[in-house]
Amino acid sequence: MRKYLYSENGFTEKAEWQPNCWVNVECPDNDDFKFLTEELKVPESFLEDIADVDERPRTETEDNWLLTILRIPMQSNQRGVPFITVPIGIITNDGIIVSVCYHHTELIPDFIQHTRRKNIVVNNKLDLILRIIYSSAVWFLKYLKQINNDVATAEKELEKSIRN
């Protein structure tokens, strides 16, 4: 799924791509892949790196392109593993900003809503990258709080069972 977002008192979605917009691609399909590689000329190697579930956070440059890979938290559907991290790639050059994640997460939609609620204007690609890193940190803390609550509950239950 591909969205074109423009920063005007928060991100607003538009119908088509224009220079200096943010293209957010979530769970890309063949049409998205074709758009990114053929129309925007995004290096295929970047998209392949982002698809690797074990990819580590890093930056890489190729020609005029910059790839920034982050690991963002998301809820897991695996039993006994409440949360996992997945890679998201932010690919930029002079007039193009693209984020690609091969998983549906709550982070990006929440980030977009936050910019709208607070009327945040993102002026450049580095500002966007830093704000996404900050948003990721907020989600890590949110999930850590849930884990701490689960641990506290388990400790109370264990203490109670030991007394009986």
Which residues does each PLM region occupy?
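Peripheral, non-transmembrane regulatory/ligand-interaction domains of membrane transport proteins
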Residues: 1-164
